[in-house]
């Protein structure tokens, strides 16, 4: 059999582009919200797709509610690349606020609509499709391509990629490509770290009619702290020269894509978002407790 070229594999993929579009749509139509939903249906879909493509796969997990799917094509030796993606999506929230069904997977002339389209069922579909095309092409790989599909990423990844790495499933890999959404035609070299802070304040309750004169308002106390969080965004990471060069280009691209001068600085600086606040029981009571959850993203070099 003659050697299959890279160009031939590419042309095969192009000829099946509509199959890829359908695959993205099919994945979107399976609700897989995290932490409010279930991952079983979408994981079973992934396993069936691989099986139908003639690619053996394995389900592994430490939590049956968040299973991972592993597959490999190619040789045991040689250069090894992991394709990593997650099938869970953030909750759709109030569906009445959507202009369309978030789980319709509707295909327009330019877009595929639905919750998790870019983050990251399109990426997962691309990986599944790539595995199938490589298999069907008969291309002989000089190494192997390993597929890691996880179902816990949006809520911290404890049962997803983190668990896979800690238990040796990524051992021996030379590189990993993660299908998270980035700017068109660009490859990012890393991701910021994530940190969730739970901030709590205690006060002293009193009747609301005495607010400002009696009691100690826990919400107001915590609000003063939250006002200071913007100071965190002044903290910048520390980089090697090669990383600094890549980050400079990424900043320029980000500002061009988003159209907001200065927004590219988020790549090299700490970011902080107050996502949830809970406090108080009634409007006519001075609250004695308040809690806020803050999402902090850390660049390279910030511990």
Describe these PLM feature segments.
Residues 2-113, 136-141:
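Acidic/His- and Gly-rich active-site-bordering loop/insert found
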Residues 72, 187-191, 284-285:
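Short glycine-biased active-site loop of nucleotidyltransferases that positions the nucleotide triphosphate
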Residues 58, 81-83, 148, 175-177, ...:
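Hydrophobic/aromatic beta-strand patches that form the interior of the parallel beta-sheet core
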Residues 112, 117, 122-233, 253, ...:
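Fold-level recognition of mixed alpha/beta catalytic cores in primary-metabolism enzymes, strongest
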Residues 2-8, 32, 58, 196-303:
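Metal-dependent amide/peptide-bond hydrolase catalytic core
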Residues 33, 88, 154, 182, ...:
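Catalytic metal-binding/acid-base residues of hydrolase active sites
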């Amino acid at each position: 059999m003659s050697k299959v070229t890279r160009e031939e594999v590419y042309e095969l993929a192009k000829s099946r582009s509509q199959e890829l579009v359908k695959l993205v749509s099919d994945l979107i139509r399976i609700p897989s919200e995290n932490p409010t939903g279930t991952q079983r249906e979408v994981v079973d879909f992934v396993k069936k797709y691989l099986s139908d493509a003639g690619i053996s796969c394995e389900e592994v997990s430490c939590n049956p509610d968040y299973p991972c799917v592993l597959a490999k094509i190619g040789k045991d030796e040689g250069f090894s690349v992991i394709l990593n993606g997650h099938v869970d999506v953030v909750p759709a929230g109030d569906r009445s606020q959507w202009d369309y069904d978030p789980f319709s997977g509707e295909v327009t002339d330019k877009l595929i609509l639905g919750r998790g389209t870019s983050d990251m069922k399109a990426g997962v579909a691309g990986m599944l499709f790539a595995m199938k095309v490589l298999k069907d092409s008969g291309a002989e790989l000089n190494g192997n391509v390993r597929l890691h599909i996880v179902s816990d990423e949006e809520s911290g990844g404890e049962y997803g990629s983190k668990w896979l790495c800690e238990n040796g499933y990524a051992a021996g890999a030379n590189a990993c490509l993660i299908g998270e959404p980035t700017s068109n035609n660009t490859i990012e070299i890393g991701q910021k770290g994530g940190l969730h802070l739970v901030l709590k304040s205690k006060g002293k309750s009193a009747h609301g009619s005495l607010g400002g004169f009696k009691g100690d308002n826990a919400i107001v106390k915590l609000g003063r702290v939250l006002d200071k969080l913007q100071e965190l965004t002044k903290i910048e990471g520390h980089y090697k020269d090669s990383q600094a060069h890549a980050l400079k280009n990424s900043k320029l691209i980000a500002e061009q894509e988003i159209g907001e001068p200065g927004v590219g600085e988020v790549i090299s600086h700490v970011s902080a978002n107050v996502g949830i606040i809970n406090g108080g029981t009634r409007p006519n009571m001075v609250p004695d407790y308040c809690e806020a959850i803050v999402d902090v993203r850390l660049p390279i070099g910030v511990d």
